[in-house]
Amino acid sequence: MKYVYTGLAALLTIALIVVLNIQLPVGNSKTPRLGYFLSPQQGFWQNAESDNTDFGGEIVLSGLKGKADVYFDNRLVPHIYADNDADAYFLQGYLHAKFRLFQMEFETNVAGGRLSELIGKDGLAIDKYFRRLGMVYAAENSLKVMEADPVVKSAMDAYTAGVNAYIAHLKPNQIPLEFKLLNATPEPWTNLRSALFLKFMSYDLTGQGDDDLLMTNTKNLLGYNMFQKLFPDRADSLDPILPIGTTFEKPSIVPKIPVNVDSVYYGISGGTSTAIPPVMPNKNNGSNNWAVSGSKTKSGRPILCNDPHLGLNLPSLWYEVQISTPTQNTYGATFPGAPCVIIGFN
């Protein structure tokens, strides 16, 4: 009988080893290996957070040029105090990575047409759309302009170094839970990723989606005259901002038309056309601002309000922070993925 028990125990052990090393299919993706995910040393248990997390202490980071301090208030908003701007942006990148690393990588993978690398075939249609939209090409060109300015380049380089400093200090058990769920690891951050994120925000804030492409197809179908009747450039009741007859010293920029206009929207290969489903931004997105004269306020001082029309996300699109250096003292909302304060005050 003891041989039966021994054999049974061996079979159960082998079965357990096999089960803990398989990846279960979920849609077109797979779960992480169960043994790794359930491991007390490296799995999701390590991502549990204590209610009494202590942010005190000192960290030595080789990328800093001088001494810097970060204080967290009772809402865990970080207040960065640095001897120079580069160190402040370095710490901003470090903090963004510490609290929002997966969000940063996920959003830039979407913009760069690499979502399927994280979630499998389910992201392929979105990847095709953003690649044919030319998001990476646009980000590369924007980055050239940004890095031509030494001040901007210094800020981006410092920010990127800060993000990578955090990633370099991550141990396997400290990788954010979302990466573990997708059986992925964080990639090194680059200035191009920051440019990609900013381009993605520009795309999201246009609120127009594929209107240009849809209108072009409609005009081709109905003809120019009928299209102008249905979709005039402006309503008759509106006066143009520029008076009729205004002339300009330089001609307007006329974009070059592709040899095959349809190739912008359709993936043409071997004489066949396959429509790419558009990824439509929210048409309610956008931003504006408003001001109140000092004569209408209790304090007698004017009020200027930035009013972004953006949805609620979890985690939030924004990350609140104060940046204080000898050349600036700003407080406000930042984008995880890019340096500086986007909306704030001095």
Predicted regions: what is each one?
Residues 2-303, 308-315, 327-328, 332-334, ...:
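Substrate-recognition/specificity elements adjacent to catalytic centers across diverse enzyme folds
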Residues 320:
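Carboxylate-rich, divalent-cation-coordinating active-site regions
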Residues 324:
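Core nucleotidyl-transferase/polymerase catalytic module
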